[in-house]
Amino acid sequence: MMVYIMNAFDIKSTKMDVLSISLHTSDLFDLEDVLVKLGKKFQESGVVPFVLDVQEFDYPESLDLAALVSLFSRHGMQILGLKHSNERWAAVAMKYHLLFCLSHSENVKELGQVEVQKTEDGQKARKTVLITSPVRTGQQVYAEDGDLIVTGAVSQGAELIADGNMHIYAPMRGRALAGAKGDTSARIFIHSMQAELVSVAGIYRNFEQDLPDHLHKQPVQILLQDNRLVISAIGSE
């Protein structure tokens, strides 16, 4: 793996094993009872970080997230992020300074997720996640085991992650990471290249200065060649 070294710090890819807890009730008293019973186990491990899966709740208003964060914290558990198949939860996560993980479920048609049919040899094809709204500063979208298509503008400080390819049909000012699980054949296609950072299969490049005119704010594709990131104008020879 290559690491791009900057003056003050290094950027490199990493993977962490983090618990995912699926929430089945919004009743704080019921949750308190369970956490009290499990309290000793968690206290022995120190602070336990985890992602809270809120897929069973359709609307953010159905949960008192501030109370949930406080409740889990009192019992030695720290919520790192929220997981849901509806991107409206991203704004809620950002409000509480949490990460947002876009999950997959059978009822995410409003997000435009496409379950691709099996290929002729019976292998399951990649899924595609479509995001049509802007991705704002502090938000993170992750297309797990599939490709990501974004048609809304991506703000500086926002992050897009896909295990497969990435297509961004709008100005891209945030971070784009394709091939997140190591797929070196993944590519990134950007309609208007203004990204802070791009990565394919863990190989990064950040942009402290604007690219040359034939690439800056122009349609580009980004791919790996000989373990190096190559950025080229779409349509160029």
Curated annotation (Swiss-Prot):
Provide this UniProt record's keywords sorted from A to Z: Cell cycle, Cell division, Septation
Q: What are the recorded Gene Ontology BP terms?
A: cell morphogenesis; division septum assembly; regulation of cell division; regulation of cell septum assembly
Pfam families on file:
MinC_C, MinC_N
Q: Does the keyword Cell division apply?
A: yes
**InterPro entries with a match to the protein in the record:** CAP/MinC_C (IPR016098), MinC (IPR013033), MinC_C_sf (IPR036145), MinC_N (IPR007874), Septum_form_inhib_MinC_C (IPR005526)
Q: Which residues form the signal peptide?
A: none
**Superkingdom assignment:** Bacteria
Q: Which family does it belong to?
A: Belongs to the MinC family.
Subunit-level organization: Interacts with MinD and FtsZ.
Function summary: Cell division inhibitor that blocks the formation of polar Z ring septums. Rapidly oscillates between the poles of the cell to destabilize FtsZ filaments that have formed before they mature into polar Z rings. Prevents FtsZ polymerization.
For this entry, the protein name equals: Probable septum site-determining protein MinC
